[in-house]
Amino acid sequence: KKKRGWDTPAPCHYCQWKGPQCCVYYCSSCNYEEAREEGHYVSSHLLERQGR
C-alpha cells in the first residue's frame, strides 16, 4: 500500500512553503534546531514536542 504524501512528515522547507498549518499537521518530524538555523517557521506545537 503506497503512502500518500501527507502521511509522511515533510521537510521543514516544505512546511514553510505550504505555511504554518502545514507545519503543525504534516511536519511532525521537523527538527527545531535545524528549522531555526534555516530561519523556518516552527509552530508552538512542534516546540512542545521537541521539549523546546
From Swiss-Prot:
Keyword list, A-Z = Amidation, Cleavage on pair of basic residues, Disulfide bond, Ion channel impairing toxin, Knottin, Neurotoxin, Secreted, Toxin
Q: Which residues form the propeptide?
A: 1-4
Q: Which GO terms describe its cellular component?
A: extracellular region
Q: Which GO terms describe its molecular function?
A: ion channel regulator activity; toxin activity
Q: In which tissues is it expressed?
A: Expressed by the venom duct.
Source taxon at top rank: Eukaryota
The UniProt transmembrane annotation reads none
At which residues is Glutamine amide found? Q50
Localization? Secreted
Function in brief:
Probable neurotoxin with unknown target. Possibly targets ion channels.
Q: What is this protein called?
A: Conotoxin Cal6.3b
